[in-house]
Amino acid sequence: MTVRPRLAVGQGIDVHAFSDDPARRLVLGGVDLTGEGVGGLAGHSDADVVAHAISDAVLGAAGLGDLGRHMPDTDPQWRDADSLDLLRQVVSLAADAGWVAVNADCTVVAERPRLAPHVDRMAELLAGALGAPVNVKATRAEGLGALGRAEGIACTAVVLLSGDDGTAARGPGDGEVR
């Protein structure tokens, strides 16, 4: 007898405008891109839209709400927090609820800086925090809207989680024990 895994998909999105603070660091997917020709993003934590989108996707798949519910921007303990640490905490919350990450896929939308040279390192750092493979893609808004005018950066993410629903699987194609 085998146990049938349960699967859940979560979606996340995060958007931050560029900060007016010239000293603000730009962190995306855990990679510090300060000095790449743009300022940092405005936000309570380090404003890493990539880590935030993946965190929201994990929480959504696990049925645990969103990042703001667990780590509100009104709480001083999250001020300038490392978003990879936040992602690790989210993964722990999901694990406590019986879930583990299978993989994640995300798309960063930014006119600048140029992200192609950094996506592999982002994927590596994010995978370390998530405990599962992460694919990172970058695209541009091609001049359309606030993102196209380079007023900020956005990221969308999808995460697959697996858990154990405790039911015995029987029958062909359903994990039959022979």
List PLM regions with ranges:
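A short glycine/serine-rich beta->alpha loop
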Residues: 32-45, 73-78, 143-147
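Polyampholytic, low-complexity intrinsically disordered segments
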Residues: 16-21, 25-35
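Glycine- and Gly-Pro-enriched alpha-helical subdomains that act as flexible
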Residues: 57-100, 111
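C-terminal edge-of-domain segments
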Residues: 149-168
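General beta-strand structural signal in soluble alpha/beta enzymes
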Residues: 7-11, 135-138
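Active-site His/Glu-centered metal-binding helix of metallohydrolases
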Residues: 50, 54, 58
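Short, conserved loop-to-beta-strand elements that form functional interface hotspots
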Residues: 103-148
